[in-house]
Amino acid sequence: MQKQAELYRGKAKTVYSTENPDLLVLEFRNDTSAGDGARIEQFDCKGMVNNKFNYFIMNKLAEAGIPTQMERLLSDTECLVKKLDMVPVECVVRNRAAGSLVKRLGIEEGIELNPPLFDLFLKNDAMHDPMVNESYCETFGWVSKENLARMKELTYKANDVLKKLFDDAGLILVDFKLEFGLYKGEVVLGDEFSPDGSRLWDKETLEKMDKDRFRQSLGGLIEAYEAVARRLGVQLD
């Protein structure tokens, strides 16, 4: 399956058309961004690590009954995916307090959230991805009530699967975001799951093993990503 025209270039991925109108090529680049793209740097091997990491996670979620857009790996940095009609709202699950939640509520980083929090954010870099709720989604027609309920159900199911997966690997799944789209009328998980869009801490040391290493200038970004992948059993070679 050959990629054709570039359809969209995001902060860290590029989407291409193929000869099949129902399939796309998703290319993971070495770019890493923070501050809604205000700061961008390149890290060797990052595209490869995130591509293979995402493929591994999407397969685990598919095995658990969560429909995903993943078809197959094409190369170290590319995968073939179903073309989705993407919902312009991202779903976030928080198992522990971190990031914007700590700033917004003035609570201590790391406290356990039981039950986990579920947040919705409008995907809009210019507006810094504002937080919204179900009422906004319905009023502005971003997603139907039924499809949003399905997105929420699948997000919580993914959380159950991934919390155990990471716990077994000695990691805490602090929080993560998921994006969904429609494929022939069905809600399907799209975009990616990687340390770019999740927070992962070492269970023993609470060391941050995700993109916060870049956001907070801690260093060792790729080393952390590769360490997480190895713990999970992701084949990087």
UniProtKB/Swiss-Prot annotation:
Pfam family, one: SAICAR_synt
Keyword Iron-sulfur: no
A single Gene Ontology CC term: cytosol
Pathway the protein contributes to: Purine metabolism; IMP biosynthesis via de novo pathway; 5-amino-1-(5-phospho-D-ribosyl)imidazole-4-carboxamide from 5-amino-1-(5-phospho-D-ribosyl)imidazole-4-carboxylate: step 1/2
Matches recorded under InterPro entries: SAICAR_synt/ADE2_N, SAICAR_synt_PurC, SAICAR_synth, SAICAR_synthetase, SAICAR_synthetase_CS
Recorded catalytic activity of this chain's protein: 5-amino-1-(5-phospho-D-ribosyl)imidazole-4-carboxylate + L-aspartate + ATP = (2S)-2-[5-amino-1-(5-phospho-beta-D-ribosyl)imidazole-4-carboxamido]succinate + ADP + phosphate + 2 H(+)
Upper classification of the organism: Bacteria, Pseudomonadati, Pseudomonadota, Gammaproteobacteria, Enterobacterales
Keywords: ATP-binding, Ligase, Nucleotide-binding, Purine biosynthesis
EC number: 6.3.2.6
Family affiliation: Belongs to the SAICAR synthetase family.
Keyword Lipid biosynthesis tagged: no
Record GO terms (molecular function): ATP binding; phosphoribosylaminoimidazolesuccinocarboxamide synthase activity
Gene this chain is encoded by: purC
Listed name of the protein: Phosphoribosylaminoimidazole-succinocarboxamide synthase
BP terms from Gene Ontology: 'de novo' IMP biosynthetic process; cobalamin biosynthetic process
